[in-house]
């Protein structure tokens, strides 16, 4: 597979934030009389505000916004257990050394994403697309289209690296190549992605003299 740049999801792709996410959302579910497993099954890969609107249907936007602010603070400050996933730091460092453009494109808000990126010790991206920068979150294509644009690349020149069904669908809808890493077996359209891997450690990247990037 050939490309010119990478668009990485953050949670579940570059960082293991599952313990923190499950703590925050399970506590939120219990406070609202909901089954934690139902909430956790819905939220993966989606913007927090989308999940809150789903589970707080009928509530005012002011109530939902207040709940979002509270939850955002919890997720941005309670980072215990968050670590870089195997291969993440090595891959990003290699891209930087080779001069290959890459971005982080996440459904998380800026405070939450920045906190998790920092605690995991990841290299700084050239472009950081968070929930605030798009009107429609994953699985819509907006975030990945913006990421490609900010890198100065066409969507078809980019490879999206994702673990969540919503993110895989977003990358495909944007017209990007897609690598699914540790994605659920029942992910819709999984048969349409370019590669299905279990770990970032399986990705080998080589930059050609003409600027093309070969992924194996």
Swiss-Prot record:
One Pfam assignment: Hydrolase
EC number(s) on file: 3.1.3.22, 3.1.3.50, 3.1.3.23
Residue ranges of the TM segments: none
Binding-site positions, substrate: 9-11, 106-107, 138
Top-level lineage group: Bacteria
Cofactor(s) listed: Mg(2+); Mn(2+); Co(2+)
Enzyme class: hydrolase
Positions that bind a divalent metal cation: 9, 11, 163
Catalytic-site annotation from UniProt: 9, 11
Gene Ontology MF, one: manganese ion binding
Record's catalysed reaction(s): sugar phosphate + H2O = sugar + phosphate; D-mannitol 1-phosphate + H2O = D-mannitol + phosphate; D-sorbitol 6-phosphate + H2O = D-sorbitol + phosphate
Cofactor binding mode and count: Requires the presence of a divalent metal cation for activity. Can use magnesium, manganese or cobalt.
Recorded phenotype for the gene knockout or disruption: Cells lacking this gene show a reduced growth rate at high butanol concentrations compared to wild-type. They also show a consistent change in the level of mannitol, D-sorbitol, galactitol, L-tyrosine, 3-amino-3-(4-hydroxyphenyl)propanoate and N-hydroxy-L-phenylalanine.
pH dependence: Optimum pH is between 6 and 7.5.
Keyword annotations of the record: Carbohydrate metabolism, Cobalt, Hydrolase, Magnesium, Manganese, Metal-binding
GO terms (BP aspect): carbohydrate metabolic process
InterPro entries: HAD-like_sf, HAD-like_SPP, HAD-SF_hydro_IA, HAD_sf, PGP-like_dom2
Homology family: Belongs to the HAD-like hydrolase superfamily. CbbY/CbbZ/Gph/YieH family.
Annotated function: Sugar-phosphate phosphohydrolase that appears to contribute to butanol tolerance. Catalyzes the dephosphorylation of D-mannitol 1-phosphate and D-sorbitol 6-phosphate. Is also able to dephosphorylate other sugar phosphates in vitro including ribose-5-phosphate (Rib5P), 2-deoxyribose-5-phosphate, fructose-1-phosphate (Fru1P), fructose-6-phosphate (Fru6P), and glucose-6-phosphate (Glu6P). Selectively hydrolyzes beta-D-glucose-1-phosphate (bGlu1P) and has no activity with the alpha form.
PANTHER family, alphabetized: FRUCTOSE-1-PHOSPHATE PHOSPHATASE, GLYCEROL-1-PHOSPHATE PHOSPHOHYDROLASE 1-RELATED
Name listed for the protein in its UniProt record: Hexitol phosphatase A
Organism for this UniProt entry: Escherichia coli (strain K12)
Gene behind the chain: hxpA
């Amino acid at each position: 597979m050939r490309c010119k740049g990478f668009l990485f999801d953050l949670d579940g792709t570059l960082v293991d934030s599952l313990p923190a996410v499950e703590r925050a959302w399970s506590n939120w579910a219990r406070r609202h009389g909901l089954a934690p497993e139902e909430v956790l099954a819905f939220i993966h890969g989606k913007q927090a505000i989308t999940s809150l609107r789903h589970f707080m249907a009928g509530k005012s936007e002011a109530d939902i916004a207040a709940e979002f602010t509270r939850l955002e603070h919890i997720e941005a400050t309670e980072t215990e257990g968050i670590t870089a996933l195997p291969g993440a730091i090595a891959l990003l460092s290699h891209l930087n050394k080779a001069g290959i453009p890459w971005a982080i494109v996440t459904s998380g808000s800026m405070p939450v994403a920045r906190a998790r990126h920092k605690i995991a010790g990841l290299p700084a991206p050239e472009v950081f697309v968070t929930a605030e920068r798009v009107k429609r979150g994953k699985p819509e294509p907006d975030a990945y289209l913006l990421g490609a644009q900010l890198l100065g690349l066409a969507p078809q020149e980019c490879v999206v690296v994702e673990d969540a069904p919503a993110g895989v669908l977003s990358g495909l809808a944007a017209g990007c190549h897609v690598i699914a890493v540790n994605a659920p077996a029942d992910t819709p359209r999984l048969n349409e992605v370019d590669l299905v891997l279990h770990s970032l450690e399986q990705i080998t990247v080589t930059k050609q003299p003409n600027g093309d990037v070969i992924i194996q």
